[in-house]
Amino acid sequence: MNTSDFDFNLPEALIAQTPLKKRDSSKLLVVDHQKKTMKDTHFDHIIDELNSGDALVMNDTRVLPARLHGEKTVTHGHVELLLLKNIQGDQWEVLAKPAKRLKVGSHISFGDGRLKAIIKEELDHGGRIVEFSYEGIFLEVLESLGEMPLPPYIHEKLEDRDRYQTVYAKENGSAAAPTAGLHFTEELLSKIEAKGVKLVYLTLHVGLGTFRPVSVDNVEEHQMHSEFYSLSPEAAQTLKDVKANGGRIVAVGTTSIRTLETIGNKFAGQIEADSGWTNIFIKPGYQFKIVDAFSTNFHLPKSTLVMLVSAFAGRDFILDAYKHAVDKHYRFFSFGDAMFVK
């Protein structure tokens, strides 16, 4: 299986640079991979695709303002750090620029010196382990000094930070938003719940691997980065009950899918409370164990996310759906439109 098998033509004008004024006014392409049908609608009609007794599973991770601009304390050279994941205490794995000038022992200062960092370890591809020092609460310092880590294909300034968070974001820890969830409003979720759909939350902290292009020709050789996930006992029990009563598990986004399928693989197709690190790579040939349907945004050509969607619905059909989306001027990527796959 070659990476080029998942390529498609995408005009740059279709890459959404800003979110729509109303979250749920985005377009929704409903695709049925068994009937091979496609239907154009709007996101607030996703409620029509959900049945009483289903579970809608969402990732409640919250994006950190994880991009920090500072300077080396000796040379005053500009430094940019992107927080990837918390290792322990005040130690973080970061992506550093310019990495070659940041050796072990280098000191960095941010803002007015309220936040400082020292390089503890050098990793591959510009990665570093840093230890922060500060007064007060780290997340509060980060909120005041950090910027939202928007994807590299978004060039417009984000006017409202909250638009790169889901309305149900709660657990701090992501370097990127679980973008399929950006379309939901509190009002729409209330209507969905009133229909008899169970709203269930899990956590997966999205790492930067989500934007990293596949750099190998052979799909099998691609290595996924590990991300932390968690499913609570209460959430697991709700999902078990839904399955037992014949309801569907409907995942919101690829991060929810990857969490649920990680758990399904670990517990022989069953749903159990669990937490840990996952680097699951779902590609054609994979047999889904938990997820029955899902919503997701439109992804980059040749990305692992297109491969995941193709694993569920078939590569040829998904590429047909993407061609339809391009022809109909759907908006792509993080601030773009969505598809519902069943």
UniProtKB/Swiss-Prot annotation:
Judged by the first EC level, this protein's enzyme class is: transferase
Q: Which Gene3D superfamilies match?
A: QueA-like (3.40.1780.10)
Please give the GO cellular component terms listed in this UniProt entry.
cytoplasm
One biological process term in Gene Ontology: tRNA wobble guanine modification
Pfam families, alphabetized? Queuosine_synth
Q: Which SUPFAM superfamilies match?
A: QueA-like
The EC number(s) given in the record are 2.4.99.17
Q: Main location per UniProt? A: cytoplasm
Catalytic activity line of the entry? 7-aminomethyl-7-carbaguanosine(34) in tRNA + S-adenosyl-L-methionine = epoxyqueuosine(34) in tRNA + adenine + L-methionine + 2 H(+)
Record-linked InterPro entries: QueA, QueA_dom1, QueA_dom2, QueA_sf
Could you tell me the keywords of this UniProt record?
Cytoplasm, Queuosine biosynthesis, S-adenosyl-L-methionine, Transferase
Q: How does it assemble?
A: Monomer.
Q: What is this protein called?
A: S-adenosylmethionine:tRNA ribosyltransferase-isomerase
Native organism: Streptococcus mutans serotype c (strain ATCC 700610 / UA159)
Recorded name of the encoding gene: queA
